[in-house]
């Protein structure tokens, strides 16, 4: 039995999230069908971060076990020939059996991209979020500082989250502007359901002047989702990096999405 790690990129617009759900189109379901065709036996895939419906990934990492022998090249090109065009396998690598895409990960990084203009984006509407009021990224950065560190993030946890604990550790939050786009970049050890989208909702309210930067601290301390801001739409969210111990020697991919410089 061999264990294979994969790098995966996908546009999540047409999918009901990563995780397999009966009678629904999911990224995991499509990847497993494609790999099963290459392996000639059923393949079950485990990923680093189970993205929600409509959320994208430029650097998802997954693994599967197989009794089939294929070269790394064959796994990549064989799977891609069986996948829909909005999912791509970027790389494949044989790994030791102690590697686990989810539990071996040390950190994940997400980017939420907001098109900040009074007129909504027509062409990239499925690829970025939108806010029509001017956003002050310095105010957003000031609010974000209250969220860095290890905290109970119950106020940022979506309903139905199955995590055993709401405690997470945020290593870094960076807010920056690229022309008309404001990028909210968050790195943490792990994330709760809707956590990044709820953080983005709070920071956008701060950036638009609706709330003061210290409102982020008020929301955090409340430990009550009802005290938080709106949950921003999923289309602007990307899983852009998963970090692992260097001994696994996994390929490094550039942070995405590709349309950011």
UniProtKB/Swiss-Prot annotation:
Annotated substrate binding sites: 110
Similarity annotation: Belongs to the tRNA pseudouridine synthase TruA family.
Known role: Formation of pseudouridine at positions 38, 39 and 40 in the anticodon stem and loop of transfer RNAs.
Name of the protein in its database record: tRNA pseudouridine synthase A
Reactions that this protein is recorded to catalyse: uridine(38/39/40) in tRNA = pseudouridine(38/39/40) in tRNA
GO MF term (any one): RNA binding
Catalytic residues in the record: 52 (nucleophile)
Keyword field: Isomerase, tRNA processing
Assembly information from the UniProt record: Homodimer.
EC number: 5.4.99.12
Gene3D superfamilies (alphabetical): Pseudouridine synthase I, catalytic domain, C-terminal subdomain, Pseudouridine synthase I, catalytic domain, N-terminal subdomain
Gene: truA
HAMAP family per record: TruA (MF_00171)
Coiled coil residues, start to end: none
A Gene Ontology BP annotation from the UniProt entry: tRNA pseudouridine synthesis
CDD domains in alphabetical order: PseudoU_synth_EcTruA (cd02570)
UniProt source species: Coxiella burnetii (strain Dugway 5J108-111)
Top enzyme category: isomerase
InterPro entries on file: PsdUridine_synth_cat_dom_sf (IPR020103), PsdUridine_synth_TruA (IPR001406), PsdUridine_synth_TruA_a/b_dom (IPR020097), PsdUridine_synth_TruA_C (IPR020095), TruA/RsuA/RluB/E/F_N (IPR020094)
